[in-house]
Amino acid sequence: MNKIRKGDEVIVLTGKDKGKRGTVQAVLGDKVAVQGVNIAKKHARPNPMLGTTGGVVDKVMPLHISNVALVDANGKPSRVGIKVEDGKRVRVLKTTGAVVAA
């Protein structure tokens, strides 16, 4: 069970984007792509078959999953634990003890 999933609200803990918040767009193994965070400029070639124009494109680059943390109700970063409730494993915030919506 992944502790961070697509759609979670996270905050960046380290790096050039430290303190920024965003929503997880994708989980790629041990990396996560966070909307509006860690944006790089990539040069794209024009493709007349697809009708795309070339130029410089902003692209979201993935961050290591250990460099982000879930945001609790108080807006603070929180680690995530796993508990068993009613025979199912649920994610629980360590700071508040609240269950994270699946």
UniProtKB/Swiss-Prot annotation:
Gene that this polypeptide is encoded by: rplX
Protein name: Large ribosomal subunit protein uL24
InterPro entries found in the cross-reference section: KOW (IPR005824), Rib_uL2_dom2 (IPR014722), Ribosomal_uL24 (IPR003256), Ribosomal_uL24_CS (IPR005825), Ribosomal_uL24_KOW (IPR041988), Translation_prot_SH3-like_sf (IPR008991)
Subunit structure, interactors included: Part of the 50S ribosomal subunit.
S-S bridge residues: none
Source species, domain of life: Bacteria
Gene Ontology molecular function, alphabetical: rRNA binding; structural constituent of ribosome
Pfam family, one: ribosomal_L24
Keyword line: Ribonucleoprotein, Ribosomal protein, RNA-binding, rRNA-binding
A Gene Ontology BP annotation from the UniProt entry: translation
Function: One of two assembly initiator proteins, it binds directly to the 5'-end of the 23S rRNA, where it nucleates assembly of the 50S subunit. One of the proteins that surrounds the polypeptide exit tunnel on the outside of the subunit.
GO cellular component: ribonucleoprotein complex; ribosome
Protein family according to the UniProt entry: Belongs to the universal ribosomal protein uL24 family.
